[in-house]
Amino acid sequence: EIGVRLVGSEMCIRDSASTDDSVSILNHYKTNSRVAHLEINSVNTGSPFAQWQKGISLSRGKYIWIAESDDAADSSFLEKAVSVLNQYPHTSFCFLGSNCIDEKGNELSTDFDRWTSKQLRRPHNIGIFDGEDYIKHNLYWRNYIYNASGVVFRKQCFEQIKDLSCFSMRYSGDWLFWIEMARQGSVVELYEKLNLFRLHSTSTTVEGNASGNAILEDIQVVHYVESFSYPIGCYKRLMRHGMLYKNICLLYTSDAADDLI
């Protein structure tokens, strides 16, 4: 349902050869006045990030929201995110919190935000961060932006990105994308949970973690950040490399356990 409260918005809807009933649902929006583009692929691209790139290129607006089809948002989500971005014109993107739900829509206790009391005491529930600091303290360590549906970003900042290799990735492209976006300006966080993030027992992320292919892309992202001129100390680099090594060990330990079973 298209129920967000934002005047002058448009929608670009893309489907990558879904095997469920997504196509029949999307076809209902063909005549909706707010749908500027509706494109359904006959073949799955194999990468959600290639879909991102196409959708962004088609968009004509000042701000972009990548609304994943399985997720949902409060009707005030876009209104509040855009208001914050208008208030802070030097920011690249606005990141909001999400409540997690399972495949059937039941709310889960999982909390990826884990906001501190200090964060929740900020004026107007807003935190502003220098992009470089945000990378060093958050995005270097993990894909801190765990849900793309919880972000609204400036198209102008996206257009300043020189390296678009994130879109050719299968698993870690979103992580690299947010790193590139943070390099284009400050980052604003709005400490309100206005999104629903659906977790699946089977997904590209789960498959990538099980196969080990996701770790290979994670290593590429970490090394890429370390190539920046940002001063990341030797001790922190060793800690980060240790985290990658631990994930590799867990993968092989899991494989060994499966062989024993």
Task: Tell where the protein language model's regions lie, with residue ranges.
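Single conserved hydrophobic/aromatic residue that forms the stacking wall/gate
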Residues: 1-8, 13, 252-261
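Glycine-rich, basic loop-to-helix element that forms the pyrophosphate-binding segment
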Residues: 1-2, 41-59, 72
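Acidic donor-binding segment of Leloir-type glycosyltransferases
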Residues: 9-39
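Active-site acidic Asp-centered loop
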Residues: 16, 67-69, 95
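Acidic donor-binding/catalytic loop of UDP-sugar-dependent glycosyltransferases
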Residues: 21, 71-84
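Short aromatic/hydrophobic "clamp" motif used to bind/position activated sugar donors
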Residues: 64
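Conserved nucleotide-sugar donor-binding catalytic segment
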Residues: 74, 96, 114-214, 218
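Conserved donor NDP-sugar-binding/catalytic core segment of glycosyltransferases
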Residues: 78-116
